[in-house]
Regions:
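Intrinsically disordered, low-complexity N-terminal segments that are enriched in acidic
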Residues: 39-153
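Hydrophobic alpha-helical membrane-insertion segments, chiefly the h-region
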Residues: 28-37
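Alpha-helical and coiled-coil interaction segments, frequently adjacent to or embedded
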Residues: 91, 286-322
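Flexible, surface-exposed loop/gating regions in the mature catalytic domains
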Residues: 201-255, 263, 279
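Secondary-structure boundary elements
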Residues: 158-227
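Hydrophobic/aromatic-rich core segments of domains that either
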Residues: 236-303
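Short hydrophobic targeting helices and cationic amphipathic motifs
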Residues: 3-4, 12
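N-terminal Sec-pathway targeting helices
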Residues: 11-29
Length: 322
């Protein structure tokens, strides 16, 4: 009798243990279900924190320039907003058209910051203006996943055929107007004068943009093709062509823009100086071709003393110009 009681107790204990285990499993499953997002997020971000990201591949138009607003980076796990800006700049500057990077677990606002940056067209335009026109975007797509992966896709402004065509034209122009005895300032002036003497401002395209807030997609006045091949340009066409010339001289430079205008700025002899071809090629009532040098290699104070409307740039984007 005593023997059977022991067996019964053991059997009962075994049943209770099985029930307890089942109960604990159910509780565990409930907890996992309730916190499934957090658990998955923790697991995935732990993995993404350790994913090795190689730098974007570089083409011939990448520049090793470092600016106050953005610089090249080899850190593709951002820890703050500036890191994201540097990743965007590095990707564009490299000439890459598809690149991914990853948020880290300890950067809790990373995805929100990427979204904010992707919706800030002024900021994106500023980064775009700092790279070679050949690497600049026509359209930029930035997407994110819930678990920290960000992807950049770039639809470039210039096609490969257009780049070859422009480069051939640049070499042709250089052979005619540049010689080895010229100083850097002389070469800059030669490029400035050539573009103005062979280009007129495209008033029709400017009026179309003013009315429709867009321009004919077949019109090339907003690109270097306009002034170099068609003799017509908007401010973006002048500045793209001039930037390509300045890049040939390996001078740190970028385009600078406001809501209504864009021009060039470069670092020469220890100073940041502005060049505005559009305003040195004024539209006249009799359509005569006028060449000015009012906006050639001038500092920011002189620039703003000449015009405070179209040239009133956002100083927070260009700290070196203050």
């Amino acid at each position: 009798m005593f023997f059977f009681n022991i067996i019964d107790i053991i059997f009962l204990g075994d049943k209770l243990m099985k029930k307890l285990i089942r109960f604990l499993i159910i509780i565990l499953l409930i907890v996992v279900y309730i916190y499934r997002t957090e658990i998955i997020s923790f697991s995935v971000t732990t993995v993404t924190d350790n994913i090795k990201v190689d730098p974007p591949s570089s083409n011939n138009y990448k520049k090793d320039y470092t600016f106050a607003f953005a610089s090249n980076t080899d850190n593709f796990h951002p820890k703050n907003k500036q890191d994201i800006i540097n990743i965007l700049y590095t990707t564009l500057n490299s000439g890459e058209d598809d690149f991914s990077f990853y948020c880290t677990r300890d950067y809790s606002t990373c995805l929100d910051d990427i979204k904010d940056i992707s919706q800030n067209q002024d900021l994106l335009s500023t980064i775009n203006n700092m790279v070679s026109p050949y690497n600049s975007y026509k359209k930029l797509y930035i997407t994110t996943s819930t678990y920290g992966k960000a992807n950049i896709k770039i639809d470039k402004l210039y096609t490969d055929d257009e780049i070859v065509m422009i480069n051939n034209k640049i070499e042709e122009i250089k052979s005619k107007i540049i010689n080895t005895n010229m100083s850097t300032e002389d070469m800059l002036k030669a490029y400035h004068d050539y573009l103005i003497n062979n280009t007129v401002y495209d008033e029709a395209a400017a009026e179309e943009i003013k009315i429709n807030n867009s321009q004919n997609k077949k019109n090339n006045s907003h690109k270097a093709i306009g002034p170099l091949f068609e003799g017509m340009a908007l401010c973006s066409g002048y500045s793209d062509a001039m930037k390509i010339f300045i890049d040939e001289l390996n001078i740190p430079n970028y385009k600078i823009s406001t809501q209504s205008h864009v021009w060039n700025v470069l670092y020469l002899n220890g100073k940041w100086l502005h060049i505005d071809l559009t305003w040195d090629d004024p539209v006249t009532s009799n359509h005569s071709n006028v060449l000015l040098h009012n906006y050639f290699l001038i500092d920011a104070n002189t620039l703003l003393s000449l015009d405070m409307t179209s040239h009133n740039f956002n100083k927070s984007y260009y700290p070196e110009l203050n």
